[in-house]
C-alpha cells in the first residue's frame, strides 16, 4: 500500500504489466543476477557453459550483458519515439539514442552501467509522461531497474 501511495503522490499509477513482457523482462535480468552472485562468491554452474558466454566470469558477464541490455533499451525508446509527432519528435529521437551512445563511448565498468540504467529509468519516466510508453511501462521498469541496479551495486567485482 505504501508503494502505491508513493507512486500516486508522484502522479504515477502502477498498472498491471502484461504477462509476456513481465516474464521476458524477468528472464532478461537473470544473467545480471547470476553475474552478481558469481562476483560475491557463488561457484559457477557448470551446466550453463554450453549456453551462457562468461558462464564462470561474473565480471565479464556483468559488463558485456549489461552493455547489450542498455543498447536494447535504446531500441525500445526508439520504438516509443516513433509514436511522437510535432515539436517533441526531434528531442525524443535524440533521447532514445542516448543510451547506445553512452555505452559506446563511456561504459567500461559496472559503475558506468549503474549510471546508465539509472539514466534509462529517467528516460522511461520522460517517455511515459509524454504518453509514448504504454500505461503499464513504469510498473515493469521500476522493479526491474531496482533489481538490475542492486546487482550492479552489490555484485560489482572489487
Provide a role label for each language-model segment.
Residues 28-32, 94-104, 140-156:
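Small-residue-rich segments of transmembrane alpha-helices in multi-pass membrane proteins
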Residues 116-128:
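Alpha-helical transmembrane segments and their membrane-interface exit regions
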Residues 112-116, 130-145:
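A cytosolic-side transmembrane-helix exit/cap motif
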Residues 106-113, 158:
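Transmembrane helix interruption/hinge and helix-loop junction motifs
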Residues 55-86:
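Short, well-structured hydrophobic secondary-structure segments
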Residues 41-56:
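Membrane-interface helix termini and inter-helical loops of multi-pass transporters
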Residues 14-27:
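N-terminal membrane topogenic signal
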Residues 76-105:
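Helix-adjacent hinge/juxtasegments
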Amino acid at each position: 500500500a505504501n508503494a502505491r501511495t508513493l507512486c500516486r503522490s508522484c502522479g504515477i499509477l502502477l498498472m498491471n504489466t502484461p504477462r509476456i513482457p513481465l516474464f521476458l523482462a524477468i528472464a532478461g535480468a537473470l544473467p545480471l543476477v547470476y553475474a552478481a552472485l558469481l562476483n560475491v562468491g557463488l561457484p559457477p554452474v557448470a551446466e550453463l557453459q554450453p549456453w551462457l558466454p562468461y558462464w564462470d566470469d561474473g565480471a565479464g558477464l556483468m559488463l558485456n550483458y549489461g552493455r547489450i541490455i542498455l543498447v536494447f533499451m535504446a531500441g525500445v525508446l526508439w520504438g516509443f519515439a516513433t509514436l511522437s509527432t510535432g515539436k517533441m519528435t526531434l528531442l525524443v529521437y535524440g533521447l532514445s539514442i542516448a543510451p547506445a551512445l553512452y555505452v559506446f563511448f563511456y561504459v567500461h565498468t559496472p559503475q558506468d552501467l549503474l549510471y546508465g540504467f539509472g539514466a534509462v529509468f529517467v528516460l522511461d519516466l520522460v517517455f511515459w509522461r509524454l504518453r509514448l510508453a504504454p500505461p503499464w511501462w513504469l510498473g515493469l521498469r521500476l522493479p526491474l531497474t531496482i533489481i538490475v541496479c542492486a546487482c550492479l551495486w552489490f555484485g560489482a567485482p572489487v
